[in-house]
Amino acid sequence: MKRIKMHHFGGKNICATWDEVAQTLEQTVDGVNEFYIAAEHTMFPYLAVLVKGDYAYVHCVPNETDGGLIAFSDDTPTDLPQDGISIFYTNTPTEEIEIYNDYVIPKTLAWTVVKDFVETGEMSNCVEWEEL
């Protein structure tokens, strides 16, 4: 695994192992956080992971000219209303962003997406991806 930089509401961590990444992912401010995850000294590709309680939203940006892709999973449903919207937080623990529940996945699945990304540098196959 390459060294990974993780920006989040609490600051920035440089992680050399999956255990360090996992410890960083557990950091929240009132149960929420936003993580920007990329290999150290690079900007792309990166994952943006928004976390709220047991749920997450994952957005991958492969390069600077790509709008990115959003993770979703029909195989791992949540108990959220299918046609609803969930509030997550971006930039600060108080700035709200609305996310369609179709793109909200269990936090445990998001951690698998992150693990695959930090170990391989590739997008995970454990979810489907929709291009923006």
Q: What are the residue ranges of the model-derived segments?
A:
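Acidic, proline/glycine-rich low-complexity IDRs
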Residues: M1-V32, V61-L132
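Short, well-structured hydrophobic secondary-structure segments
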Residues: A22-P62
